[in-house]
A protein has these predicted regions:
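Short secondary-structure subsegments characteristic of cysteine-rich extracellular domains
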Residues: 42-67, 223-235
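Helix-rich alpha-solenoid scaffolding regions
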Residues: 58-84
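Outer-membrane beta-barrel initiation region
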Residues: 1-51, 57-59, 89-96, 119-126, ...
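Outer-membrane beta-barrel pore domains and translocons
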Residues: 47-51, 66, 78-82, 139, ...
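Residue-identity detector for glutamine
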Residues: 22-23, 62, 76, 104, ...
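C-terminal outer-membrane beta-barrel translocator/porin domains of Gram-negative envelope proteins
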Residues: 74-122, 192-197, 203-268
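Membrane-spanning beta-strand positions in outer-membrane beta-barrel proteins
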Residues: 41-43, 72-74, 145, 242-244
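Outer-membrane beta-barrel strand-turn architecture
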Residues: 36-38, 67-71, 140-142, 183-185, ...
Length: 268
């Protein structure tokens, strides 16, 4: 996902270099990251981009810090101002944990999704999100790893059936935690990135969030919460290949607007 340029700085992730969507038009970005040769336990990453359609600058900056310990313990501080799909939440990242291109939006998803679906609906579900975040990721043993995070920000509404420019803005603050439980699974760690070598045993994911939100037409904040569960399993069928499946379930507590609903992957 990165292009080496010199010993201490590399370009990437490469999906940030160029994008196209109906809100921004053609967007060109300059993403950079420090390398392990500069700091083994610290990574600085940032991107500045300009959209020719909305004529606006956007981007993000993040700091990753790894504690010098035998097991993985990392801290991430991040601020982003980017367009994202309103249907993708934090727990959804587990479903795509092994993908090289793991963003919510990139050039390929923009082009193919825009060609396949009604352009009006495609346009409406991408929203500009401005968010600050602090996240802790920890390994406790070879079976259990956890994440805990605090995020505060604002986002567009993103409901597909409503006119984009008439939709309200949502302000939110959220405390979340999740756990990943695996059994005898091999993990490959590189510079602030992990890949999983799945075996024939299931992987279990659980998550919970508690937060508050307010739309710009509401006088005060409301509380909400959610619980999520996912099971991933790869079954070796020998000469018949393999079967990969996911099971997902969850609960949302409180009266919530569209951006706080959970959207399951696949055709609906």
């Amino acid at each position: 996902s990165y292009i080496p340029t010199n010993k201490y700085v590399e370009v990437g992730k490469i999906h940030h270099l160029i994008k196209y969507n109906q809100q921004e038009g053609l967007r060109v970005g300059i993403p950079l990251r420090t390398t392990e040769a500069l700091w083994k336990h610290v990574s600085l990453e940032a991107m500045v981009a300009y959209g020719t359609g909305d004529r606006a600058f956007k981007g993000f900056g993040q700091v990753n810090i790894a504690l010098p310990s035998e097991r993985r313990h990392t801290v991430q501080l991040k601020y982003r101002d980017l367009y994202v799909y309103s249907e993708v939440d934090d727990f959804e990242e587990y479903r795509r944990e092994n993908k090289i291109f793991n963003p919510q939006v990139n050039l390929i998803t923009d082009v193919f999704r825009g060609a396949r679906f009604n352009p009006k609906y495609f346009y409406n579900t991408m929203t500009r999100r401005q968010e600050g975040r602090v996240q802790f990721a920890d390994d406790w043993n070879k079976y259990l790893e956890t994440k805990a995070y605090i995020k505060v920000g604002q986002t567009g509404y993103g409901e597909a059936t409503r006119n984009y420019h008439s939709q309200p803005t949502m302000f939110y603050s959220t405390l979340g935690a999740s756990a990943r439980i695996s059994f005898n699974e091999r993990k490959v760690d590189t510079y602030f990135h992990r890949r999983y070598i799945y075996n024939n045993l299931p992987v279990i994911y659980v998550g919970a969030e508690l937060g508050s939100y307010r739309l710009d037409n509401m006088p005060s904040y409301r509380m909400y919460g959610n619980l999520q569960l996912m099971l991933r399993h790869r079954v070796d069928l020998g000469m018949g290949g393999e079967l990969n499946y996911l099971l997902q379930a969850g609960l949302v507590f409180g009266k919530v607007p569209y951006p706080l609903l959970h959207h399951f992957a696949g055709n609906q």
